[in-house]
Structures are given as C-alpha cells and as structure tokens.
Amino acid sequence: MASTSASGTMAVKYGTMKTVISGLTVVLPNGDIINTGGRTKKTSAGYNLTNLFIGSEGTLGIITEVHLRLSPIPESIMSAVCHFPTLEDAVQTAQQVIQYGVPIARIEMLNKDQMGISINYSKLKDIQAVPTLFFEFHGSESSNNENIKIVEELSKDNRGSSFKWAKDLEERNKLWKARWDVYYSVKALINNGRVYSTDVCVPISKITECVNFAEEQAKKFGVRAPMVGHMGDGNFHVVLPFDPENKESYKKIRAFNDTLIRKALELNGTITGEHGVGLH
C-alpha cells in the first residue's frame, strides 16, 4: 500500500498513505538501509524522503517497515444509503457535502448499472438499482446528528430519497455489502472474465463533469461501465468487465481509458488516484 500510495474509502476523513505514514525503513538498491521521518509532529530537516518513497512503486528502494499515525476510535459510527433519480444528482450532492466542509468519514457512489449488478450478485434486499450514495459519519453522537442534518438537506435538494440507516456493526456491514462486492460482482458477469478498472482523480469542483464525461464516452465506445467512486476525494473507478480472449473488446476498453485519462488531465486531475501506474 505504501509503495503505490494507496488509499481506501475513509481517505476523505483519515487521509491516504502519505497522510498516515510518519516514517519508513527502506532498503536502497546498493543494500544500504535507511530510516526516514520519525515520531515527531513536525520536522524541517531537509527533503521529505518519506513522501518520496511512498508511491515510488519499488523504483527507489524496498520498504520494509512503516510507522503509522493512529486515529482514536470514534464514539459513534452511523451509516446511511440514499438513492437518486440520476447519477448527476448523486455526484452533485457528494460534491456539495465536501464543499460545505462536512467532516464525513465515507461518501461512496455506485451508478445504476453497478447497483443492479451488486444487488443480483449479493442477493440484496431493500435497496434499489438506481444511482446511490453510501455515507458514513464518525464522531460524537451530537456532532454526527448535526452533520447528518446538513447532508440530508443537501441530498433532498438534489432529489435524494429518505436515508436508510444502520448503527450497529452487523447492520452497517449489510448496508455496505453492495459497495464491498463491486469487483467480484462485475467479474462474475462474464465466464472466466476479467476486470479492468480506471483510476482517474480530479478536483472536487470537476468531479460531476468528469463522471458525466465517463458515462457519455462509455456509450460512445460501446462498453459496459459499472461505476464506483470515492466522491470525497474526487477519485472514481469505471469497473469494466471483459473476456481476455476477446482482443477487440480489450482494445475498446483501453481506448476508453485513454480518453478518460486525457479528460482528467484536462481538468487538472491525475491518471491514478490510488492504484499506481504499474511500473515494472
């Protein structure tokens, strides 16, 4: 995870690997072992070697040890699902939640196609195959309630449904199952199929434009485009199923990804938000 500068669904609140790692032990190509960073809150001692090695994908050295910053376990954790009539409504809501400065722990998006795939694969009930946002709030009960009011109001303004809530761990896991099963549900669409995932990341102010562009281009290229997004940090994945024996299908997917990458760069984004570039 450190080598690719990975992150997860809670990066919007707790940060990426660059945020949570305070120091590394690294073996350099010549065999030397170095330690970067430390346990202090701050330092002005030269170059930030820790951040240089994070995301370098093994090209500068092999990371053998990491020092992590820990966060306290929140007093209260609350999860919710909200459905929307269009993908644009859902993405716009997420964009506004971040722009309002709501300290949300997770805000994940699944488009209509992905919701349908997940529901069928995981035999889920009480959720709909429509564009959906998954929210999670961490904090004290009172602060969570205040933040929930804001998010519910923003969702309502964008034609969102009433929230479906989960408080205890078992309920939360059921609620999030559609999200956790994304990869396997898409892989199961094709016998012996594979999955190609895009990983562009754009500024929050451009996330609606980029997601809309991805949907338009998927239609243009004739590819099926289930979608999942970490809306809190502008990162989303088009999760494309393909048959490895079908060369033409794979070419189409690569061409679609190239087009999406160019759009992300045009919007001052990046080609990869968390997966890395796959250096060998």
Segment roles from a protein language model:
Residues 230, 270-279:
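Short acidic/histidine-rich active-site segments
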Residues 245, 279-280:
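Short beta-alpha connecting loops at secondary-structure transitions
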Residues 5, 55, 200, 272-273:
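Short conserved micro-motifs on helix faces and helix-strand junctions that flank
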Residues 72, 81-86, 91-259, 263, ...:
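C-terminal substrate-recognition/cap domain of FAD-linked oxidoreductases
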Residues 1-108:
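FAD-binding subdomain of flavoenzyme oxidoreductases
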